[in-house]
Amino acid sequence: MQEQKLQENDFSTLQTFKRLWPMIKPFKAGLIASGIALVFNALADSGLIYLLKPLLDDGFGKANHSFLKIMAFVVVGMIILRGVTNFISNYCLAWVSGKVVMTMRRRLFKHLMFMPVSFFDRNSTGKLLSRITYDSEMIASSSSGSLITIVREGAYIISLLAVMFYTSWELTLVLFVIGPIIAVLITIVSKIFRKLSKNLQDSMGELTATTEQMLKGHKVVISFGGQFVEEERFNKVSNNMRRKGMKMVTADSISDPVVQIIASLALVAVLFLATTPLIAEDNLSAGSFTVVFSSMLAMMRPLKSLTNVNSQFQRGMAACQTLFAILDLEPEKDNGTYKAEPAKGALEFKNVSFAYQGKEELALNNISFSVPAGKTVALVGRSGSGKSTIANLVTRFYDIEQGEILLDGVNIQDYRLSNLRENCAVVSQQVHLFNDTIANNIAYAAQDKYSREEIIAAAKAAYALEFIEKLPQGFDTVIGENGASLSGGQRQRLAIARALLRNSPVLILDEATSALDTESERAIQSALDELKKDRTVIVIAHRLSTIENADEILVIDHGEIRERGNHKALLEQNGAYKQLYSMQFSG
């Protein structure tokens, strides 16, 4: 059985960006508009510096007041151009970033919904939430910010070089010696930044998972006085994240001054060259020297930004790799083509053995039994004996590698997954409700399929109508996250109503009445007894009183069937079932 682990591949920046590009490509018009605006923004900046030469040589040097007045309007025009192009570039890039993040999140969300249950067993919810929220946003903020810097500062440097070369090509040659050194430096630190950024994102996932664990288990924490334990756990994880963050800052802080020092050497070289006879005799005016020197000073900022953008861009690429690691995982297998509308409900297990991923011990060992259509089989045994595993295999939450499970004589592997699960309704011990109305929770994923009358009928059959009618908006009451405003018994009744409404031929009740009081349990049991006439029912129960009328009872122990028969026959055997029964009713 293939293990579904999150494991990032160490692709190069170029390989990662190539995978990201198909998500960006549909919005390339925004990128082009932003790029053009950034280029004009850079030209306006470099143009302002170039104007220093005529201002100094012609305007102030020759006291040409008419020229100075004209130049004043030119300067204002260039500043307006800078403002307009800055707005266009920022807006267009924000639009593209938002679209890319939305596309990535939608792909992730859809992919996660089709992952097998085993994937979620092995990966914490907190880390997955961090991937969808933090990492996807990191792609937008890092990549868009990096793109702005690369295009604007790159265009600015090129335009400054053009201005310098046009003004004095001799002095400009100094930069062609310094440039390759800076390029080599940036290449070296890029791999370091990507590795450090990956570690930082992993720490963010651990932090989210730790926080989520405390929030979800808050009642347990305060009940057992575990605040100190959780605080220590959180402090350790948050300090680990802080340390990894400081490594990023250290690498960033070291690379920045190194580039600045190398660039400053170019300024020193220009000052010395300006005094040499070759340059001095070449009619180098004050305006020309000022333009070259100012251009070199102005180039310090974009060089610094381009150095910093590398770390920013690597954070985005590292986030991409973590997200692509999820998208590369194989979704739940759905190779079947058979459809039954509806199935009759005859179930059969043939020599089924099963072990959970990462565990050598078998959860089920050579299990064989059959349930004729319309009959009820009950599974009893101690916790961890394998009862719930049997229920999970019927719906293919997990796939077996040994044996067969048949529905109406057809291997469930041959069914289309959606069709198989349409024919099975599950009510488990742990009820999950959505932050929606009661009606929408009962008719979940099929609100348009059922009428309000059918929803009310299902609620009535589940003995939920009484408490629903007492709520402020009745069936239109929003119940909060996971039904937080309801009691455990009320939540369980809604889950039963959901299963009743679905009207599937196979009904799986995994401790379905465990959260109900005795009176409610009797009422629910009466409703379930009526359902057994037309459905195949698998009942998993600790309370043996709820399964006395089952057509067959299987006693499961350590993944094997120890005893089988109806209630009366098993009591007469005086075996494991009799012991369980005596333990429950001895008091």
UniProtKB/Swiss-Prot annotation:
The chain crosses the membrane at residues 31-51, 68-88, 145-165, 169-189, 259-279. Its main location: membrane. Residues 32-315 form the ABC transmembrane type-1 domain. Gene3D superfamilies: ABC transporter type 1, transmembrane domain, P-loop containing nucleotide triphosphate hydrolases. ATP binds at G381, R382, S383, G384, S385, G386, K387, S388. The keyword rRNA-binding does not apply. Keywords: ATP-binding, Cell inner membrane, Cell membrane, Lipid transport, Membrane, Nucleotide-binding, Translocase, Transmembrane, Transmembrane helix, Transport. It is an enzyme of class 7 (translocase). GO terms for molecular function: ABC-type oligopeptide transporter activity; ATP binding; ATP hydrolysis activity; ATPase-coupled lipid transmembrane transporter activity. GO terms for cellular component: plasma membrane. Involved in lipopolysaccharide (LPS) biosynthesis. Translocates lipid A-core from the inner to the outer leaflet of the inner membrane. Transmembrane domains (TMD) form a pore in the inner membrane and the ATP-binding domain (NBD) is responsible for energy generation. PANTHER family: ATP-BINDING CASSETTE SUB-FAMILY B MEMBER 10, MITOCHONDRIAL (PTHR43394:SF1), ATP-DEPENDENT PERMEASE MDL1, MITOCHONDRIAL (PTHR43394). Homodimer. Belongs to the ABC transporter superfamily. Lipid exporter (TC 3.A.1.106) family. This is ATP-dependent lipid A-core flippase.
